[in-house]
Each structure stands twice: as structure tokens, then as C-alpha cells.
Curated annotation (Swiss-Prot):
Native source species: Rhodococcus opacus (strain B4)
GO molecular function: ATP binding; metal ion binding; nucleoside diphosphate kinase activity
CC terms in the record's Gene Ontology section: cytoplasm
UniProt-listed Enzyme Commission number(s): 2.7.4.6
Cited function: Major role in the synthesis of nucleoside triphosphates other than ATP. The ATP gamma phosphate is transferred to the NDP beta phosphate via a ping-pong mechanism, using a phosphorylated active-site intermediate.
Keywords: ATP-binding, Cytoplasm, Kinase, Magnesium, Metal-binding, Nucleotide metabolism, Nucleotide-binding, Phosphoprotein, Transferase
Name listed for the protein in its UniProt record: Nucleoside diphosphate kinase
């Protein structure tokens, strides 16, 4: 079954020059890039994207980080795209949970600045794609 997922190549990955490497891994996995945009995240979209973390101690720093520089937002499509990208990304904590061969395992240093975001479910993907790419929401 073809799925869609939202991927963010976060500001730390952009600043460190990993956009091409990450996009290459996505393409080599066989996922289709349906939308791609380099942008700085507006505060309202960032807050809505991370709303589930509101009130947690790391929330203000997370918003500051994600809005603090350019990022790449993308919609990927393919069979089991959500799980496929999450496998490419690796565990959330790049040092303790991400294995070598994954994006975070190969390039990550910190849990919050962990290079990429990928939707974790079909429901999250639909909500996140509607935030970042409203033109895809009805499709």
C-alpha cells in the first residue's frame, strides 16, 4: 500500500551540509519525493507541529531550534513510506538508540538536534502534511 509521510530535514542537518546525503538515501530506498521546499519554519506551524510536547521542559528550546534556521520539508510516497523512512532515520537519540547505517546513527550527536523528523503514523502524516503542505491535504 502506498503511503505518504512528512519528512523534515532539520536546521542542524542543513547547517552541517547533509541535505544531499539525506535526500540520496531517501531516493536509494525507493521512496518518491512528491514535494520539497527549503524554508524557515514559521512559529505557528512549528507550534502546531510539536503541539503534543507543549508544557514539557524541552518545548521552548525545541521551537527555538526548529525555527532558528532553514530546514527542508518534504512529502515522501511509497509502499510503507512511514516505516521505511523511520528505518532510514534511526532511533531518536543518535548516540544511544540509532545504529550505524542510519541517518542519525551516522551523523547525529544530540537527541533534540537529531537531523530529521518523520511522521510516526498515518494519522500524524496526514496532520503534518496538512500543516506544511496544505495543497496536499485534500489529495
Amino acid at each position: 500500500m502506498t503511503e505518504r509521510t512528512l519528512v523534515l530535514i532539520k536546521p542542524d542537518a542543513v547547517a552541517r551540509g547533509y541535505v544531499g546525503e539525506i535526500l540520496g538515501r531517501i531516493e536509494r530506498k525507493g521512496l518518491t519525493i512528491s514535494a520539497l521546499e527549503l524554508r524557515t519554519a514559521p512559529g505557528d506551524i512549528a507550534a502546531a507541529h510539536y503541539a503534543e510536547h507543549e508544557g514539557r521542559p524541552f518545548y521552548p528550546g525545541l521551537l527555538e531550534f526548529i525555527t532558528g534556521g532553514p530546514l527542508v520539508a518534504a512529502v515522501l510516497e511509497g509502499p510503507r513510506a512511514i516505516a521505511a523512512f523511520r528505518q532510514l532515520a534511526g532511533g531518536t537519540d543518535p548516540v544511544e538508540k540509532a545504529v550505524p547505517g542510519t541517518i542519525r546513527g551516522d551523523f547525529g550527536l544530540e537527541a533534540q538536534e537529531n537531523l530529521v523528523h518523520g511522521s510516526d503514523s498515518v494519522e500524524s502524516a496526514e496532520r503534518e502534511i496538512a500543516l506544511w503542505f496544505p495543497q496536499f491535504a485534500a489529495n
